[in-house]
Every structure is written in C-alpha cells, then in structure tokens.
C-alpha cells in the first residue's frame, strides 16, 4: 500500500505542477491577447481618425469647389439678366442699346456682384459697400 500512496503522491505533484504551468500559460496567453487587442484597437482608432480627417478634408474641398461654382453661376446669371434688361430697355425705347450698361464717361458699368469680396477658403462673406447702390426716388 505504501507504493500505492507514493505513486498517488507523485501523480498529485505532477498534477499540481501541470496546473501551475497551465495557470502561468493561461495568464501569459491572456496578457498577450490583451496586448494584441489593445494594439489592434489603437491601430483601428488611428485608421478611423485618419479616415474621418481625410473625409472631412475632401468634404471641405468639395464645398469650396461648389461655392466657387455657385459664385461663378450667380455672376453669370446676373450678367445675363443685365444684358437682357438692356435689350428690353432698348427695344421699348427707354435707351439706346449701345449706351445701356455704360456710365457717364461711356465706360462699362461694374455690377454689384463684381465688387463683392469673395474668399472661397473663408466661410465668412462680406456684404458689398453701400457706395455701389443708388438711391431711387419714384416720380410723383
């Protein structure tokens, strides 16, 4: 029976040693897993931040391009409107077509939109000065 007890004791020591190694192995594996997860998480976060920044920059560029196109379009529409009004005025006899759109010296008049400061990189636009406007007093 003594041999039997000695054998069980050796088996117990082996199980304890294996359990310790397993516990140490599991703890080490858990530590490595945690490091790996944190590394992947940080790289993913960096990637997301970079991606969001890139999208924001591209969006800003597109808004700037659209803003420039809108200003160009508005200027073109205003110019065509002035030309159309000049043609109507000439056709109805309110003025000579070659004199419409010119100031007293005979030079072409500048439109209000041309005087408007536009900075596509800046989101703030200023209103044109009131010097470009003329007072209108209807005849009685």
Curated annotation (Swiss-Prot):
Modified residues (N-acetylmethionine): 1
Region (Interaction with SERF1A): 111-140
Claim: Repeat is one of the keywords in the record: yes
Pfam families reported for this sequence: Synuclein
Domain of life: Eukaryota
Modified residues (Phosphoserine): 87, 129
Localization annotation: Cytoplasm; Membrane; Nucleus; Synapse
InterPro entries reported for this sequence: Synuclein (IPR001058), Synuclein_alpha (IPR002460)
GO CC annotations, alphabetized: axon terminus; cytoplasm; cytosol; extracellular space; membrane; neuronal cell body; nucleus
First-listed, main subcellular location of the protein, grouped into a coarse class: cytoplasm
Positions with biased composition (Acidic residues): 112-140
Keywords: Acetylation, Cell projection, Copper, Cytoplasm, Membrane, Metal-binding, Nucleus, Phosphoprotein, Repeat, Secreted, Synapse, Ubl conjugation
Binding site for Cu cation: 2, 50
Gene3D superfamilies on file: Helix hairpin bin
One GO MF term attached to the UniProt entry: copper ion binding
UniProt region (Disordered), positions on chain: 98-140
GO terms of biological process kind: chemical synaptic transmission; regulation of dopamine secretion; synapse organization; synaptic vesicle endocytosis
Phosphotyrosine PTM sites in chain numbering: 125
Function: Neuronal protein that plays several roles in synaptic activity such as regulation of synaptic vesicle trafficking and subsequent neurotransmitter release. Participates as a monomer in synaptic vesicle exocytosis by enhancing vesicle priming, fusion and dilation of exocytotic fusion pores. Mechanistically, acts by increasing local Ca(2+) release from microdomains which is essential for the enhancement of ATP-induced exocytosis.
Family to which this protein belongs: Belongs to the synuclein family.
PANTHER family listed in its UniProt record: ALPHA-SYNUCLEIN (PTHR13820:SF5), SYNUCLEIN (PTHR13820)
The protein, known as: Alpha-synuclein
Species name: Sus scrofa (Pig)
Gene that encodes it: SNCA
């Amino acid at each position: 029976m003594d041999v039997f007890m000695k054998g069980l004791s050796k088996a117990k020591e082996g199980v304890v040693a294996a359990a310790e190694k397993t516990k140490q192995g599991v703890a080490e594996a858990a530590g490595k897993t945690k490091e790996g997860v944190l590394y992947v998480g940080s790289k993913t976060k960096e990637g997301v931040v970079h991606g969001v920044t890139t999208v924001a920059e591209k969006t800003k560029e597109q808004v700037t391009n659209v803003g420039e196109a809108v200003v160009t379009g508005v200027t073109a529409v205003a110019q065509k409107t002035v030309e159309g009004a000049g043609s109507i005025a000439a056709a109805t006899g309110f003025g000579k077509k070659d004199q419409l759109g010119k100031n007293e010296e005979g030079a072409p008049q500048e439109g209000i939109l041309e005087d408007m400061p536009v900075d596509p990189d800046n989101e703030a636009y200023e209103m044109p000065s009131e010097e470009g406007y003329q007072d209108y007093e209807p005849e009685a």
